[in-house]
Amino acid sequence: MPITVKDELPAIARLRQENVFVMPQTRAKTQEIRPMRLAILNLMPNKVETEVQFIRLLANSPLQVNVELLRLDTHRSSSNSEQHLDTFYRYFSEVKNNNYDALIVTGAPLAHLEYQDVAYWDEFTAILDWAEQHVTSTLFSCWAAHAALYHHYKIKRDLKTDKLCGVFTHQCYFEHGALTRGFDDTFLVPHSRYGHVDVNKINACNELVVLAGSEKVGAYLVKNKSGSQVFITGHPEYDADSLKAEYQRDCEKSDNAPKPENYFPDDDATKQPSKTWQSHAFLLFSNWLNYYVYQTTPYDINLVSQDVRTNNYAE
């Protein structure tokens, strides 16, 4: 949240050099506040589990966030109750004329499919294009991050033979970046994917900035210059046992299922893993909501489609 101080305080200049948001009293007196309107396009098979994981992170913010759950018109989930979806979800066609302060697009278990072979690819890309005009900031998770990088910037992923699976150390590349505010120099995040995007391809795009990653996982946290698009290639939202459940499922399908790296205590799959990435996850989502949603979106949500932004955090 912003700090309000007297306009003439000398410390303001130094704090702003560090990209710390300090609000002058003159602005604070005229500031208008309303609940944030956020939509989650949930593409994961287990809807309820994914709802819990993302809403948990959103709830850690002091902001009031009104969450709407979205579903695709062109895809029917076979692993979820239609009653649950009918009760709690809205079709995209029902909300396409709305504006939102924020949108989260979850991952999807589509690792081995070419994008154009995804049954709902046309609707998915239509939503991505819609978001550019109707959403202040969109956060893409895992598969959705790779797919959005391809759709918006023509950056292709590579499909690896070996699955990247485990909890890995990452480096923060922008100490004073708004999205990375308060990050440790190194931090842990789970990954579970076959797709990989070459960091050099992202760095070659002048519209994108790689904020965090590692040699092992490549780019983890990427955003466009304005912060209207944020791409996360890992799973900071995962529960402590999410990778364990995936591993057990994979073991039922194959005798050569890769064991998650740096995850099980003593590398023993019978032991309960710890959640070593929770503080990072809370901080990441808090920063995103604060700096790229709350501090950026117009008070009149109807102005979102006119790209009226009150701040521009460009690292």
UniProtKB/Swiss-Prot annotation:
This is Homoserine O-succinyltransferase. Its main location: cytoplasm. The record marks A111 as: Important for acyl-CoA specificity. Belongs to the MetA family. It comes from the Bacteria. Residues 249-271 are annotated as: Disordered. It comes from Pseudoalteromonas translucida (strain TAC 125). Keywords: Acyltransferase, Amino-acid biosynthesis, Cytoplasm, Methionine biosynthesis, Transferase. The active site is at C142 (acyl-thioester intermediate), H235 (proton acceptor), E237. Gene3D superfamilies: 3.40.50.880. It is found in: Cytoplasm. The record marks S192 as: Important for substrate specificity. Residues 249-258 have a biased composition (Basic and acidic residues). GO terms for cellular component: cytoplasm. Pfam families: HTS. Its EC number is 2.3.1.46. One of its GO terms (molecular function) is homoserine O-succinyltransferase activity. Signal peptide: none annotated. Pathway: Amino-acid biosynthesis; L-methionine biosynthesis via de novo pathway; O-succinyl-L-homoserine from L-homoserine: step 1/1.
